UniProtKB/Swiss-Prot annotation:
Keywords: DNA-directed RNA polymerase, Magnesium, Metal-binding, Nucleotidyltransferase, Transcription, Transferase, Zinc. Zn(2+) 1 binds at C60, C62, C75, C78. One of its GO terms (biological process) is DNA-templated transcription. DNA-dependent RNA polymerase catalyzes the transcription of DNA into RNA using the four ribonucleoside triphosphates as substrates. This is DNA-directed RNA polymerase subunit beta'. GO terms for molecular function: DNA binding; DNA-directed RNA polymerase activity; magnesium ion binding; zinc ion binding. It holds the Pfam family RNA_pol_Rpb1_4. Binds 1 Mg(2+) ion per subunit. Binds 2 Zn(2+) ions per subunit. The RNAP catalytic core consists of 2 alpha, 1 beta, 1 beta' and 1 omega subunit. When a sigma factor is associated with the core the holoenzyme is formed, which can initiate transcription. The keyword Transcription applies. It comes from Acetivibrio thermocellus (strain ATCC 27405 / DSM 1237 / JCM 9322 / NBRC 103400 / NCIMB 10682 / NRRL B-4536 / VPI 7372) (Clostridium thermocellum). One of its GO terms (cellular component) is DNA-directed RNA polymerase complex. It comes from the Bacteria. Belongs to the RNA polymerase beta' chain family.
């Protein structure tokens, strides 16, 4: 049985006139839409019921047949078929044109396909199509040549000279005749010959032409189909006309455009019937051509057709393009039923896997379930009365709702959803009021706060959806970030403050040194005010060891005892194998935010997520309870200004006076003076800050808040009670007058004014950053969306070599971090003892990584997606661990999207500023987000470094006019490089350099690295450089995410010599397809093709995908579709995006084809 939704691929091509007529249910002959009196569609008009179907269900136009019983009858009076009105969404019509017109996409696109086929310039073609010149179709026995362009005058002269011996024409008819005469096979052979013979521009043109010719040859499209005889009319429901209040009508722009075409077409028919003079007919044909152009792509040629208010009308192309177009608005993102949204409030009483759902919202969301249960329980007789009960909100309904909700998870989402933790599943708990309640620990993942944020709720309906929500999306199972595998559900703010307060130790507190027989006794003493939480006390601890109860007195505080009650005592902070330490508390230290992170991390590793979820809730309760009990508040007197501040300021002012004197005497330059002043004030600011921190009491609330990591940092305290310090002006240059005051003392007007630059720049920066970061994420998702783990092991023996990533001498990312959770290529052997630390094929754990670093190993060869041999997607062994679980990655994991989200999500944190290095004419070094974009788009960087193309010895020569570096290799080959003024040279005279080494400072062009040092070098370079940017901002991202993107950038090869294969010279081909073609050629004893790896930027790479649906929905929709139609492309539907567009399950996770045939059966208990 053929099912419409069950297909494996989708093909796009040019439509032949026959095909268009076959789609159509009738010809639209009149430009009328609806009758202004009856408001019924006009017959043969754009909304005609006879062509497109009835407007009302089961009712013909004249009203002779009404009701469903006449289904399928065609009315004998009005000719309308009695059927459902929704056929008006799918039935098409057509317009028979009186003269053929060209399709603007194929004539005007870049490159002009029609022009390439006919070997004519687009300008000449435009003249012919728009009736400004003649073209010779058949020169006969005359000296004219075929396809020669004749002006009006030349044509008349030739007519006089040669009479009827030759044929020339104008307009689309002439072009169609020329297209029909083309013999593609002959032309293809000719062009291949020409490519072998010619060089330069001629060869490039021939290659371009061959591409178009081959596209037509292989797709079975005929060139003359680029000229339209008949135009399809899309269904009326897709270009609706609706009545507004006040009796006016609003109509889709397409109707206006169609109307113009029909009017002009009818006028042309009439003129032809009347036998009007040629010049009038020609003008009308030109106008018809322009009307059709406007309908297909308004504004592509000449001035766009405008509607009322000078607004360009939206043509068929505009309906597909952009964010509001069909692809992105309706196919990739749809609004869904069973959803609601509301403001969020905090729910500290909830468990981590729960959320509070307002009662009225829950009732509406679960309405069908409630109705069914009411009927099943016999509370209502039928569904209709159940619906009434729910609508009247009877008391029984609430009890039923409670039961329905019990085992039914809901999804909560907060916009913007930057990574997959932006949607998580929770078990709903009914709450009064109209706000959603959110657990405080999941706020970090959502980046939510309670200052008025809203969130959306969605209900998973099917059994499978509920199972996925429960097992994969439940918040308790998502405690780790997919970016770097660190915990994301870490207590913040009050909870941190509470834990800090609870575990702090106070010397000389009340009851210090008292001894208690048990913890209970200590708690009693505390309740009676005998001791404080922070007093040092001794308590006898009891533990059962090997079945024997032992005890020992330990020194600690009551707070720490209480805190440890919540914490498992086997996390590994204390070495329990040591008999002296059996009784020690697991957490016997001051707990701030970082310590909490460590506790949770260890708990997940030791006990797994379920136990950790319980631990998190316990810490949350303790934190809230004791931050309330501690009652830590801020008063203005807590900002204690250090006494030494005045002294430091005075000293610095004296220092600056000296500097200014030196400058006035001409001993130092202005630049040096400026730098010294800045350095002096920076030092003063740091000294004051240090004095301030040392001056604050350990129990000062401000100090506690910042030390524990609950809120605020040193920098903010410095501004409150130290000195505000130096400010930057609008260009980012530091102003040399610092703000000496702090907020406690108050600023002078001048100081306040200086500080406004920075404040505003911050806001402007943030707004720009958000947009840029979102666009970067979108491009990353598009380039990597079809990377899915497709198999367990691809069996490759290749890998990449990893070392510490360094920037100068500073280690940015350590080796251990880079190898945890990866598979080694071979055995990793201890260099001295020769013992095997990790066998090949076993994942490197944290402990292994420690051993490797201890053994002094500096380089490790690991498997990587960069060298993975899976044809589509990657394999689990090359990818390594799934960071969100720490286990091996499952087949079906959508690692491409995870990679894109992991790189895109922190994008907003990266700074925008391109900052100036001091010194003479310092190059701008791009940093932050623009640098990441520059790398991923593989652009030529700003501040380009010159690199050596050969290995050899350096000689630097400086003359008055120029600096030059000459590199001489051992075999006498030399290369010389001119050094622009202001560049800093990195090498010195007589140095040995390798090919690809930098000669001057700056960023290297990745394309040069690929050319000189090869593929592995450019991969390493890109990964390292992106890591540098993120690590500078303190953002940790695992290498594998960047590797996934880089793999996609290097997927293609550029064919240099096609040999005897069917590949086209200069074409971009997938690496795997290329290897396959060559293997085929070699097997047949033919000459294989030669190609070079191509490095594409992410936008280019996303558009170069095999899937035209994915590319068209990304950018440049018309260009992608034009090309795809000519090539007759088939979309194999392997990626995620294409499947979303056509409405199938995505081929990842349980949607993979290998799981498709599994049937689900319900087990009744």
């Amino acid at each position: 049985m053929f099912e419409l939704n069950n297909f494996d691929s989708i093909r796009i091509g040019l439509a032949s006139p026959e095909k268009i007529r076959e789609w159509s249910r009738g010809e639209v002959k009149k430009p009328e839409t609806i009758n202004y009196r009856t408001l019924k569609p006009e017959r043969d008009g754009l909304f005609c019921e006879r062509i497109f179907g009835p407007q009302k269900d089961w009712e013909c136009h004249c009203g002779k047949y009404k009701r469903i019983r006449y289904k399928g009858i065609v009315c004998d009076r009005c000719g309308v078929e009695v059927t459902r009105s929704k056929v008006r969404r799918e039935r098409m019509g057509h317009i028979e044109l009186a003269a053929p017109v060209s399709h603007i996409w194929y004539f005007k696109g870049i490159p002009s396909r029609m022009g390439l086929l006919l070997d004519m310039s687009p300008r000449a073609l435009e003249k012919i199509l728009y009736f400004a010149a003649y073209v010779v179709i058949d020169p006969g026995q005359t000296p004219l040549s075929k396809k020669q362009i004749l002006s009006e005058k030349e044509y008349r002269d030739s007519l006089e000279k040669f009479g009827p011996k030759f044929r020339a024409g104008m307009g689309a008819e002439a072009v169609r005749e020329l297209l029909q005469e083309i013999n593609l096979d002959e032309l293809s052979a000719e062009l291949r010959e020409e490519i072998k013979q010619s060089t330069g521009q001629k060869r490039v043109r021939a290659i371009k032409r061959l591409e178009v010719v081959e596209a037509f040859r292989q797709s079975q499209n005929k060139p003359e189909w680029m000229i339209l005889d008949v135009i399809p009319v899309i269904p009326p429901e897709l270009r609706p006309m609706v009545q507004l209040d006040g009796g006016r009508f609003a109509t889709s722009d397409l109707n206006d455009l169609y109307r113009r075409v029909i009017n002009r077409n009818n006028r042309l028919k009439r003129l032809l019937d009347l036998g009007a003079p040629d010049i009038i007919v020609r003008n009308e044909k030109r106008m018809l051509q322009e009307a059709v152009d406007a309908l297909i792509d308004n504004g592509r040629r000449g001035r766009p057709v405008t509607g009322p208010g000078n607004r360009p009308l939206k043509s068929l192309s505009d309906m597909l393009k952009g964010k509001q177009g069909r692809f992105r608005q309706n196919l990739l993102g749809k609004r869904v039923d069973y959803s609601g949204r509301s403001v969020i409030v905090v729910g500290p009483e909830l468990k981590i896997y729960q959320c509070g759902l307002p009662k009225e919202m829950a009732l509406e969301l679960f309405k069908p379930f409630v109705m069914k249960k009411l009927v099943n329980d016999g509370l209502a007789h039928n569904i209709k009365s159940a619906k009434r009960m729910v609508e009247r909100v009877r008391n029984e309904v609430w009890d039923v709702l409670e039961e329905v909700i019990k085992e039914h998870p809901v999804l909560l989402n907060r916009a913007p959803t930057l990574h997959r933790l932006g949607i998580q599943a929770f078990e709903p708990v009914l709450v009064e009021g109209r706000a959603l309640k959110l657990h405080p620990l999941v706020c970090t993942a959502y980046n939510a706060d309670f200052d008025g944020d809203q969130m959306a709720v969605h209900v998973p309906l099917s059994a499978e959806a509920q199972a996925e929500a429960r097992f994969l999306m439940l918040s308790a199972n998502n405690l780790l970030k997919p970016q770097d595998g660190k915990p994301v559900a870490v207590p913040t703010q009050d909870m941190v403050l509470g834990s800090y307060y609870l575990t702090i130790l106070k010397e000389g507190a009340k009851g210090e040194g008292r001894v208690f027989t048990s913890m209970d006794e200590a708690v009693m003493a505390y309740d009676n005010g005998e001791i404080e939480l922070h007093s040092k006390i001794k308590v006898r601890m009891k533990r059962v060891v090997d079945g024997v109860e032992k005890s020992k007195i330990i020194e600690t505080t009551l707070g720490r005892l209480i805190f440890n009650e919540a914490i498992p005592q086997d996390l590994g902070f204390v070495d329990r194998s040591d008999p002296d330490k059996i009784f020690d508390l697991e957490v016997d230290f001051l707990v701030g935010k970082n310590e909490l992170k460590k506790i949770i991390d260890k708990s997940i590793k030791v006990h797994g997520t379920t136990k950790t979820a319980i631990l998190l809730d316990k810490i949350k309760e303790l934190g809230f309870k004791y931050s309330t009990k501690g009652a830590i508040t801020i008063s203005i007197s807590d900002m204690v200004i250090p006494e030494v501040k005045a002294k430091y300021i005075k000293e610095t002012e004296e220092k600056i006076e000296k500097i200014t004197k030196q400058y006035k005497r001409g001993l130092i330059s202005d630049e040096e003076r400026y730098n010294s002043v800045i350095a002096a004030w920076t030092e003063a600011s740091e000294n004051i800050t240090r004095a301030l921190i040392n001056n604050l009491d350990r129990f000062n609330p401000v100090y506690m808040m910042s030390q524990s990591g609950a809120r605020g940092n040193i920098n903010q305290i410095k501004q409150l009670a130290g000195m505000r310090g130096l400010m930057a002006d609008t260009s980012g240059k530091t102003i040399e007058f610092p703000i000496k005051a702090n907020f406690r003392e108050g600023l002078t007007v001048m100081e306040f004014f200086i500080s406004t630059h920075g404040a505003r720049k911050g806001l402007a920066d943030t707004a720009l950053r958000t947009a840029d970061s979102g666009y970067l994420t979108r491009r990353l998702v598009d380039v990597s969306q079809d990377v899915i783990v497709r198999e367990t092991d691809c069996g490759t023996r290749k890998g990449i070599e990893v070392t510490d990533i360094k920037d100068g001498n500073e280690v940015i990312e350590e080796l251990s971090e880079r190898i945890i959770g990866r598979y080694p290529v071979g055995n990793i052997v201890h260099p001295e003892t020769g013992e095997i630390i990790v066998e090949a094929g076993r994942m490197i754990t944290d402990q292994d990584a420690e051993k490797i670093v201890k053994a002094g190993i500096k380089k490790v060869r690991i498997r990587s997606v960069l060298t993975c041999h899976s044809e589509y997607g990657v394999c689990a062994k090359c990818y390594g661990a799934n960071l969100a679980t720490g286990e091996e990655c499952n087949v079906g994991e959508a690692v491409g999207i995870i990679a894109a989200q992991s790189i895109g999500e922190p994008g907003t944190q990266l700074t925008m500023r391109t900052f100036h290095t001091g010194g003479v004419a310092g190059e701008d070094i791009t940093q932050g987000l623009p640098r990441v974009e520059e790398l991923f788009e593989a652009r030529k960087p700003k501040g380009l470094a010159i690199i050596s193309e050969i290995k050899g010895t350096v000689k630097i020569s400086e003359t008055k006019k120029k600096r030059e570096i000459v590199v001489t290799s051992e075999d006498g080959e030399t290369r010389s490089y001119l050094i622009p003024y202001g560049s800093r040279i990195k090498v010195s005279d007589g140095d040995q350099v390798e090919a690809g080494d930098e000669l001057t400072e700056g960023s290297v062009n990745p394309h040069d690295i690929l050319k000189i040092k090869g593929v592995e070098a450019v991969q390493t370079y890109l990964v390292h450089e992106v890591q540098k940017v993120y690590r500078m901002q303190g953002v940790d991202i695992n290498d594998k995410h960047i590797e996934v993107i880089v793999r996609q950038m290097l997927r293609k090869v550029k064919v240099e010599d096609p040999g005897d294969t069917s590949l086209l010279p200069g074409g971009l081909v997938d690496v795997f397809d290329f290897e396959e073609e060559n293997a085929k050629a070699i097997a047949e004893g033919k000459k294989p093709a030669v190609a070079k790896r191509a490095l594409l930027g992410i936008t280019k790479a996303a558009l170069a995908t095999d899937s035209f649906l994915s590319a068209a929905s990304f950018q440049e929709t018309t260009r992608v579709l034009t090309e795809a139609a000519i090539k007759g492309k088939v979309d194999p539907l392997v990626g995620l995006k294409e499947n979303v567009i056509i409405g199938k399950l995505i081929p990842a996770g349980t949607g993979m084809s290998r799981y498709k045939d599994i049937t689900i059966s319900t087990v009744t208990e």
